[in-house]
């Protein structure tokens, strides 16, 4: 079968499109015919060797944490699934990924794919959806009626976080570039502002806020200034550069290390199917272009969430 692999860490050039053996499912495993995976920034960091201590992957490595596909074969001791089922999953961060025609997945990680969108587009949901969910509801402990600032709302995690927060009854201010403004308004954000000018301070965007989500990589001194956007007794939850806590103001801080969670993913799928959660796919590209997609991400040319369609 065809797969994307790298045999050593490095730039996007280490990614190869090559033939490898089709895997055979063992006990508790499911062989999935991949429809698509998607690019996530963590794929870039793992490939570059920047996360070898946190996420130790064996070389050669097939990337692709997100999976959307169809069950092709069941291993022993697998129940609740049948050949032909459409499924999605967030694969373990250190496992062989879905940038291939077939992939082995732990049976417990698989959930039924959304019925109301194309299967390839469903690959854009798992990792970013779980990141948004866990940041909002586990780290920030979001409650109805709270004010929320999403910094980096134009990205894949940000767009889902805005929708989830609005659905939870929060008053959401979304900070993002102008090309995302109409989409974010459509998601129900009470206020959409441009990229934050930290020199202007929180009052310029209607702050401070009870909850701050920082989804943007910024310098540590900028993160310290961003803490001013959190109201006394509030929380700053980050998927990127952490915002420091301020005990004197009872400002709590937390950072995400996303994990797979089938129950949460099932809930996200249900919200997609009932129209409460919209997935924005900016580009669909063939798997063979994986190296170019990684290169585009590194140079800022990627238009947004990109799914990679298997052959």
Functional labels for PLM-detected ranges:
Residues 265-311:
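C-terminal hydrophobic helical "lid"/dimerization subdomain
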Residues 173, 185-254:
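Glycine-rich cofactor phosphate-binding loops and adjacent beta1-alpha1 units
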Residues 87-88, 148, 212, 236:
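Generic structural signal for buried aliphatic residues
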Residues 21-39, 51-94:
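Glycine-rich beta-strand-centered segment in the early N-terminal region that forms part
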Residues 56, 89-152:
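NAD(P)H dinucleotide-binding glycine-rich loop of Rossmann-like/cofactor-binding domains
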């Amino acid at each position: 079968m065809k797969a994307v692999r790298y045999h050593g860490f490095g730039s996007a050039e280490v990614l190869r499109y090559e033939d490898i053996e089709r895997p055979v499912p063992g006990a508790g495993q499911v062989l999935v015919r991949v429809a698509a995976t998607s690019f996530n920034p963590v794929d870039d960091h793992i490939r570059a060797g920047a996360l070898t201590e946190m996420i130790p992957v064996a070389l050669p490595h097939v990337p692709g944490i997100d999976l959307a596909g169809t069950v092709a074969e069941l291993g022993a001791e697998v129940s609740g699934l049948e050949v032909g089922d459409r499924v999605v999953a967030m694969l373990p961060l250190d496992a062989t990924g879905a940038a291939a025609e077939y992939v082995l997945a732990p049976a417990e990680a698989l959930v039924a794919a959304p019925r109301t969108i194309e299967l390839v587009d469903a690959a854009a949901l798992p990792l970013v959806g779980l990141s948004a969910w866990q940041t909002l509801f586990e780290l920030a402990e979001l409650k109805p009626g709270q004010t929320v600032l999403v910094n980096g709302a134009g990205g894949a995690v940000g767009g889902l976080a805005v929708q989830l927060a609005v659905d939870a009854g929060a008053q959401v201010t979304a900070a993002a570039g102008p090309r995302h403004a109409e989409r974010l308004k459509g998601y129900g954000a009470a206020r959409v502002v441009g990229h934050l000018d930290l020199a202007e301070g929180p009052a310029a965007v209607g702050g401070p806020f009870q909850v701050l989500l920082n989804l943007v990589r910024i310098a540590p001194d900028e993160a310290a200034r961003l803490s001013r956007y959190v109201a006394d007794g509030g929380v700053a939850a980050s998927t990127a550069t952490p915002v420091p806590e301020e005990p004197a103001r009872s400002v709590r801080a937390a950072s995400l290390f996303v994990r797979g969670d089938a129950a949460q993913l099932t809930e996200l799928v249900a919200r997609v199917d009932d129209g409460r959660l919209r997935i924005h796919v900016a580009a669909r590209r063939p798997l063979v272009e994986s190296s170019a997609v990684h290169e585009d991400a590194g140079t800022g040319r990627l238009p947004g969430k990109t799914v990679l369609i298997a052959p």
